[in-house]
Amino acid sequence: MAKRLVEELERDGIVKSERVKRALLTVPREEFVLPEYRMMAYEDRPLPLFAGATISAPHMVAMMCELIEPRPGMKILEVGTGSGYHAAVCAEAIEKKGRIYTIEIVKELAVFAAQNLERLGYWGVVEVYHGDGKKGLEKHAPFDAIIVTAAADVIPPALIRQLKDGGVMVIPVEERLGQVLYKVVKRGDKIEKKAITYVMFVPLR
């Protein structure tokens, strides 16, 4: 089932690199959804978790992962851990060589994600934190890449500050006509923003 889904994403031009393709084929999405949704794990759509959160659709996970151009040795911050699936895909995309710090505001979700990641062997590559993702994780900054999996009103200044020079942030931003996914690149004091597509995420709390 995973193979068919990934082939479709490849055909649609969403999966572009071997790294992301391999990561999606390696991470068992059914292990990151609630038991009642296991049969739907390889449908290309978001699925409910709890506390109003969702696990992102596979095409969105693939797209965001491709946009940061994953490579071994990267230090990545994820804001909005959810069930831990996206962090696991990123871990595989960097070949588990590097570190992913992920922060979740809902304590029950942070615990759920940590249990999933530990059970599946991602402990030591992925670190889960409970806290306010808008503030980032100053103690581990700067980051090569930041992925935000909830829609912000504005790009949080703390996240821009914690991005390495030349680093990439992928973030959905709430705008007048809807949410827009941006690829943000930091160049010294300048920020380059590129609109990618319209999206629909839960709000960044």
Swiss-Prot record:
Reactions listed under catalytic activity: [protein]-L-isoaspartate + S-adenosyl-L-methionine = [protein]-L-isoaspartate alpha-methyl ester + S-adenosyl-L-homocysteine
Recorded hits in InterPro entries, A to Z, give: PCMT, SAM-dependent_MTases_sf
Q: One GO BP annotation here?
A: protein repair
Q: Is Transferase among the key words of this record?
A: yes
Q: What is its main location?
A: cytoplasm
A GO-annotated cellular component: cytoplasm
Compartments where found: Cytoplasm
Question: Which residues of this protein are catalytic?
Answer: S56
EC number, UniProt record? 2.1.1.77
Keyword RNA-binding attributed: no
Q: Which GO terms describe its molecular function?
A: protein-L-isoaspartate (D-aspartate) O-methyltransferase activity
Question: Which keywords does the record carry?
Answer: Cytoplasm, Methyltransferase, S-adenosyl-L-methionine, Transferase
Which superkingdom does the taxonomy of this entry point to? Answer: Archaea
Against HAMAP family, the record matches this protein to:
PIMT
What does the UniProt record say this protein does? Catalyzes the methyl esterification of L-isoaspartyl residues in peptides and proteins that result from spontaneous decomposition of normal L-aspartyl and L-asparaginyl residues. It plays a role in the repair and/or degradation of damaged proteins.
Give the UniProt family note: Belongs to the methyltransferase superfamily. L-isoaspartyl/D-aspartyl protein methyltransferase family.
Name under which the protein is recorded: Protein-L-isoaspartate O-methyltransferase
